[in-house]
Amino acid sequence: MAAVATGNVDKLKSDVASLSQISENEKNGFINLVSRYVSGEEAQHVEWSKIQTPTDEVVVPYDGLAPTPEDPEEIKKLLDKLVVLKLNGGLGTTMGCTGPKSVIEVRNGLTFLDLIVIQIENLNNKYGSCVPLLLMNSFNTHDDTQKIVEKYSKSNVQIHTFNQSQYPRLVVEDFSPLPSKGQTGKDGWYPPGHGDVFPSLKNSGKLDLLLSQGKEYVFIANSDNLGAVVDLKILHHLIQKKNEYCMEVTPKTLADVKGGTLISYEGRVQLLEIAQVPDQHVNEFKSIEKFKIFNTNNLWVNLNAIKRLVEADALKMEIIPNPKEVDGVKVLQLETAAGAAIRFFNHAIGINVPRSRFLPVKATSDLLLVQSDLYTLQDGFVTRNSARKNPENPTIELGPEFKKVGSYLSRFKSIPSILELESLKVSGDVWFGAGVVLKGKVTITAKSGVKLEIPDNAVIANKDINGPEDL
């Protein structure tokens, strides 16, 4: 694909020029991305021998950060420089929900978005600050989000929404945009990954607005990461040290072997993703001995630096080709990631943060963790229960019967106690009563065609259950 002739890009330009659904900025951004891809600029393999482990100056241990000033006035000054931005482009489809993923209920009837707003409200109340919330939507989530944010109109949090770019999917066969083939619905388009956050902030006018209000840093995080809360120590450090970019990383466990890691490469700090690793080194990349940290996608970025780099068109992140199929037609989506931008910023660092700052909810198994007694909810913050002795969370595998939020919720009369659980694997048609306690290693398997009900108040410790006779 990368060897496609330039002539095809010229033809693509004229095809894209006639797409009335998108702006000139989007057309230009798309053509630039395709041109870079065609000239061979997809994620290149790194030279393995040049990789160096970053020092503590580059990846700073969280415990080594200076304490935050105690004077509330000083804290207010810090917060008045901050903007919180949540990536809100994803739908809840993998969890069986329609609409934006951020409106899935997490706990006590509160959604991801409710918790985010409550957290910032509490900060603003406590310090008299005015930290605003930005939501970067995609064309998939924009309309729903506009309606949803109306309920926060009386909040002390200013909420701004803007859209990330909308790019046409590329038909692989003849290098044409899918929408010009008569695919006029949403399937003809895609949002080009969260690397697009930087140009979209600028193109939407939000960047200049925030700079005019004296804002200096944006804290970017996925809306489904419940651990991504404002951290004053990190903000204070970045302002003191004038770091233009900070990526929060955290120690890798065996569950995170595919996550990107930070390396020192040719004198700069850089994100290394699995796609850039030569085949013979993939196992080494996945090991937790050599690469001990991974990217949480919690990012802190200086707004002036974003403006400078976007205006210079300098953010040329590695391109991630994402092949898809739409109605039998092979298409390509070209995407970029926000974490890969780290190498373009001055004085960029990582901060090695506690695992508590990485609590993503990607599936109902994650929802079970955060809805259980393993966590508590206070003031919008989901915090781990200190009564749990094991520092690691239990591993939870739920079968396809639990995949959708609706069916997951209906299968639990109440969420079991899992404070002392190490691992849980559930498969088949299993239903949980109220007040169930799970401890140690538990496997519950309903035989095909059999409904297995776990009775109220059952205590199951280190057991394999294959039928009612095992209870």
From Swiss-Prot:
Swiss-Prot/TrEMBL keywords: Cytoplasm, Nucleotidyltransferase, Transferase
Protein family per UniProt: Belongs to the UDPGP type 1 family.
Annotated function: Plays a central role as a glucosyl donor in cellular metabolic pathways.
Single GO molecular function: UTP:glucose-1-phosphate uridylyltransferase activity
Cited InterPro entries: Nucleotide-diphossugar_trans, UDPGP_fam, UDPGP_trans
SUPFAM superfamilies named in the record: Nucleotide-diphospho-sugar transferases (SSF53448)
Localisation per UniProt entry: Cytoplasm
One record GO biological process: UDP-alpha-D-glucose metabolic process
Binding of substrate, residues: G89, G90, H194, N222, S223, D224
Enzyme category, top tier: transferase
Presence of keyword Nucleotidyltransferase: yes
Any one GO CC term of the record: cytoplasm
Residues noted as binding UTP in the record, renumbered to the chain: L87, N88, G89, G90, K101, Q164, G193, D224, K362
Name recorded for this polypeptide: UTP--glucose-1-phosphate uridylyltransferase
EC number annotated for this UniProt entry: 2.7.7.9
Catalytic activity, reaction form: alpha-D-glucose 1-phosphate + UTP + H(+) = UDP-alpha-D-glucose + diphosphate
Coiled-coil positions: none
